[in-house]
UniProtKB/Swiss-Prot annotation:
HAMAP family linked: UPF0257
InterPro entries the UniProt entry points to: UPF0257 (IPR010646)
Main localization, broad class: membrane
Protein name, as recorded: UPF0257 lipoprotein YnfC
Topology relative to the membrane: Lipid-anchor
Gene Ontology CC terms: plasma membrane
Signal peptide: 1-16
Keyword annotations of the record: Cell membrane, Lipoprotein, Membrane, Palmitate, Signal
Record gene name: ynfC
Entry-linked PROSITE patterns: PROKAR_LIPOPROTEIN (PS51257)
Subcellular localization, as worded in the UniProt entry: Cell membrane
Lipidation (N-palmitoyl cysteine): 17
């Protein structure tokens, strides 16, 4: 992945030229993992992060925590979903991610530290020449992923039996505010939902506080839910 650095003139307006230059692109690992594990991708030399999703009552519904090496590999990843009462904790061990508690091999890796296979579910991933995951497949489904020139995930299409679910995201035209986006979900070409997110950003152009509005158009009348996302991020 080639990195595009923000010119100093623009950096002055954002953070001052005495600060670390802003990396505008996303690494293949960060972008691909965010697709698979459902969290907002981050940029720059991230050391560790926690991303917390809260509902309108301020109750935590989901939390994702990760630690990364200086090379951008995920050393550990924990996913807590309180709505579905699930917890997944993975730790890196050579070419696998193991369950942090049982040490069972859960995810096989390819290349430096990219997703390759989830043996228990029969899922395998394919990457493009730049190392981004662009396809996932199993006996039951096929998924295709899309990215922009900076590696930002633009959505995915999932085909399973006679159903096709497509999510298409449109990020802000401001490269600094990439996580300000809108998205539309189609089921068999029929619109069933939309999403809008707006954020405040830190000096690395990563979101710190976000408002996420999710509208379920598959029911009548449509149901709108408002969430808050808070990120705590440490850098190298």
């Amino acid at each position: 992945m080639k990195y595009k650095l923000l010119p100093c003139l623009l950096a002055i307006l954002l953070t001052g030229c005495d600060r670390t230059e802003v990396t505008l692109s996303f690494t293949p690992e960060m972008a691909s993992f965010s697709n698979e594990f459902d969290f907002d991708p981050l940029r720059g030399p991230v050391k560790d992060f926690t991303q917390t999703l809260m509902d309108e009552q301020g109750e935590v519904t989901k939390r994702v925590s990760g630690t990364l090496s200086e090379e951008g590999c995920f050393d550990s990843l924990e996913l807590l979903d309180l709505e579905n009462n699930t917890l997944v904790a993975l730790v890196l061990d050579a070419n696998y991610y193991r369950d942090a508690e049982t040490l069972e091999k859960r995810v096989r890796l390819q290349g430096k530290c990219q997703l390759a296979e989830l043996p228990s579910a029969g899922v395998s991933w394919e990457t493009d020449d730049n190392g981004f995951v662009i396809k996932a497949s199993s006996k039951q489904m096929q998924m295709e992923y899309r990215y922009d020139d900076q590696g930002y995930p633009l959505g995915k299409t999932t085909k399973s039996n006679d159903k096709t679910l497509s999510v298409s995201a449109t990020p802000s035209t401001d490269p600094i505010k990439k996580l300000d986006y809108t998205a539309v979900t189609l089921l068999n070409n029929q619109r069933v939902g939309n999403v809008k997110q707006s954020c405040e950003y830190d000096n690395h152009a990563n979101p710190v506080d976000c408002q996420l509005i999710i509208v379920d158009e598959g029911v009548k009348p449509a149901v709108e839910r408002v969430y808050t996302i808070k990120n705590t991020i440490d850098y190298y």
